[in-house]
Amino acid sequence: MYNIQDHVVIITGSSSGIGLAASTLALASGAKVFGIDISNSPTSVTANPNYTFFAADLSHPESAKKAIAACIAAYGNRIDGLLNIAGVMDLNQSADTVTDDMWDRCIAINLTAPVKLMREVIPIMRLRGKGSIVNVGSKASMSGAVSGIAYTASKHGLVGATKNVAWRFKHEGIRCNIVCPGGVAATGIRDGVDSTQFDSEALEMMSVIHQAHASDHAKGLGLQPEDLAHSLLYFLSDLSKGISGAVIPVDNAWSTI
């Protein structure tokens, strides 16, 4: 399906939502997938001999280093692709209400962990003279009107990190892009979020933006994790050769407002 036969691909957030859909599609395309998640290994892919699972809390400082060491132990000193999908939401907390814990967790998982994983895989990709990294952003990567300050800052930061990596390693065969989904059903990103704790005033301010996109689902036009998986695999593969440093909305035109 995609030209990634026998490629070693690391996928974070692999146990649910977009991460699981991407893992399933990558395996179907012949890749060897190293899945990372804080949740249990997904039963739908665990039995596949080309799937290796590593349990990790990406907010821990050493998790990226340990994960890549485990990947090398499983598949050797080869990493062709990295999909940084794992992420956490905030509670729409504003600059005047955000807690230290919420800020620290969003930055740690949504920004610091992807950067640390890139730091670990890029030297391996440089040795091979080739590699592809796809980070997953959000509508909040390009707007200040859809989420809280912690999530928004983390996703804006990931855009900057993506562009920096793309330019720095453009002559070494390493590409880096960021796909920004919006309005995807059942992503798992809200798991563990207590909806009763949302900043109601901030949520009300942003409701007009949310409602504009919610109409897609009512009309049967909402995106599913599998839709995002195809976009991610396209940009991971050589089908998108020459595309690097790009910020790609996959949100059925939500990014136009």
Curated annotation (Swiss-Prot):
GO biological process, one term: paraherquonin biosynthetic process
Enzyme Commission number(s): 1.1.1.-
Sequence intervals crossing the membrane: 7-29
Superkingdom of origin: Eukaryota
Catalyzed reactions: protoaustinoid A + A = protoaustinoid B + AH2
Location of the protein in the cell: Membrane
Catalytic residues in the record: 151 (proton acceptor), 155 (lowers pka of active site tyr)
Glycosylated residues in this chain: 50, 92, 110
Keyword line: Glycoprotein, Membrane, NADP, Oxidoreductase, Transmembrane, Transmembrane helix
Sites where the protein binds NADP(+): 11, 57, 119, 151, 155, 184
SUPFAM superfamilies: NAD(P)-binding Rossmann-fold domains (SSF51735)
GO CC entries: membrane
EC main group: oxidoreductase
InterPro entries according to UniProt: NAD(P)-bd_dom_sf, SDR_fam, SDR_superfamily_enzyme
Annotated GO MF terms: oxidoreductase activity
Family: Belongs to the short-chain dehydrogenases/reductases (SDR) family.
Protein's name according to its UniProt entry: Short chain dehydrogenase prhI
Organism: Penicillium brasilianum
Gene that this sequence comes from: prhI
